[in-house]
Curated annotation (Swiss-Prot):
Organism: Methylibium petroleiphilum (strain ATCC BAA-1232 / LMG 22953 / PM1)
Protein name listed in UniProt: ATP-dependent Clp protease ATP-binding subunit ClpX
Domain ClpX-type ZB span(s) in chain numbering: 3-56
Gene coding for it: clpX
InterPro entries: AAA+_ATPase (IPR003593), ATP-dep_Clp_protease_ClpX (IPR050052), ATPase_AAA_core (IPR003959), Clp_ATPase_C (IPR019489), Clp_protease_ATP-bd_su_ClpX (IPR004487), ClpX_bact (IPR046425), P-loop_NTPase (IPR027417), Znf_CppX_C4 (IPR010603)
Example GO BP: proteolysis involved in protein catabolic process
Function description: ATP-dependent specificity component of the Clp protease. It directs the protease to specific substrates. Can perform chaperone functions in the absence of ClpP.
Any one GO cellular component localisation term in the record: HslUV protease complex
Amino acid sequence: MPEKKGSSSEKVLYCSFCGKSQHEVKKLIAGPSVFICDECIELCNDIIRDEVPAESGDAKAAKSDLPVPGEIKASLDQYVIGQEPAKRTLAVAVYNHYKRLKHVQGVGKKEDVELAKSNILLIGPTGSGKTLLAQTLARLLNVPFVIADATTLTEAGYVGEDVENIIQKLLQNCNYEVERAQRGIVYIDEIDKISRKADNPSITRDVSGEGVQQALLKLVEGTMASVPPQGGRKHPNQDFLQIDTTNILFICGGAFDGLEKVIQNRSEKSGIGFGASVQSKTERKVSEVFREVEPEDLIKFGLIPELVGRLPVVATLGELTEDAMVQILTEPKNALVKQYQKLFAMDGVELEIRPSALTAIAQKALARKTGARGLRSIMEHSLMDTMFDLPTMDGVQKVVLDEHTIEEHTKPLLVYREQKASA
């Protein structure tokens, strides 16, 4: 019994586990008709720590949550073909960013060294994989992710989206969990389209260009953004949610068409004289020129100096080659060929795409100058009629796509079960 009578008429309480009285222990905690002392609680904690060491250690959890740069790049390799320098730069930048978050959260006292945030700027032609890189990173790290189009943003008070709408979309993606949203990734696409229209400031308002850049400044650097709750502005009496953007990683991407001319003009001015290396403009690829980009080039292009300073990590992506296009069609986890083979398999039909057809698709996509985005439209156009007729056709076992289908727009070869059996 946990209760016994003492010499005086008062009740003395005893631990139900070790039998010690309330006078022999520091604390006795009551439960439903039972008591437990502080010594027994400490003993229970020791047993749990010994038997479940993995769950009690924060180090392992931190390690599993935070892949190292090599693992990040290996995951990117599964989805993104080529662009090795950009993948390495991104892997290191993202690793350092989330290491910084662990440093901020794990340290209770004020540290001497304060780690600053390094946002990322991706420069590369259309269809080179900028958005895919950001999407793959967010999927790997299991953090909220949102893509914002810079061309739809305007200054506050004008028709269009405010920059705070980006944070609201991020909140929506994580079901309005503020803590998760504050560790998310924001990808701002077409950042080059909000460049200043001219080098010298204009007297007229540039509400979708420099004005948006000014509005993005504090958001990218870190500020308390006021976001309406789930009900939006329909309930004006509700308090706005306060989101700290200090720990949100911002990745900005753009094609920066014309930036290569700015870089070349700068390099040509610096390369004057007998010792200067003479090289024709046509000899160098745009991707090679982009690798030499300096902050002053981005400012000359039309980004304001303050925004350039807040995007310290610059990764450049190159134009895709024919071989890279063929690899994109077949190698990634969600490769286009695998997707169409899965669609045809749902109808019980095998899809075979010959190597000559893959080369023809890659060449056609390169001619369109839309990067990897052009691959799907070419595949869709080549297989459209077959996908329309196939569900109502009997006996088809295989569809074969060759270079003639791509180049001459002929119908793919159909192999029937009877023909295959007789062969």
